[in-house]
């Protein structure tokens, strides 16, 4: 999101960055997020999750929507204590057990354009933005990843977060 780029006072990189979340990070909508011992900085990031519906490899941005089964909401929690330790890989930061709650459902035939995304923490609004302010839209993300990685049904892509995610 443009708001996140501005928040960190950085220039937009030439391409999005991605990281892997192991299946053990996946959690249900009302599942318990487990803060590991010695974790001081547990960060929230409300995101729209793209769910792949059929095998996808080397597709164009224009074709990408044909491979999306639907969308859900997710919280991309992160253990920011490990941010420097992992030197950019984000595996421990984002991949720890239970840190990726998704759901409660999937919407299909949904146009992601011009939609509001909001993150609440204990009932208080913390993040708010419009999907039209994404630096790279949902179809771009699918096509970009599928240039080098085969996506299969059930794969999920967390699409990025607006400004104001904090531990």
Question: Where do the language-model regions lie?
Answer:
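Extended, compositionally biased flexible segments
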Residues: 1-44
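Catalytic-pocket segment enriched in acidic/His residues
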Residues: 4, 80-167
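A generic local secondary-structure boundary/capping motif
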Residues: 6-9, 33-42, 56-63, 90-94, ...
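A short secondary-structure junction signal
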Residues: 7, 29-32, 37, 59-64, ...
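Short, conserved beta-strand element in jelly-roll/cupin
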Residues: 19, 49-54, 102, 150
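Hydrophobic, aromatic-enriched interface-forming segments
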Residues: 46-49, 57-58, 80
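Residues embedded in well-ordered beta-strands
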Residues: 47-51, 72, 118
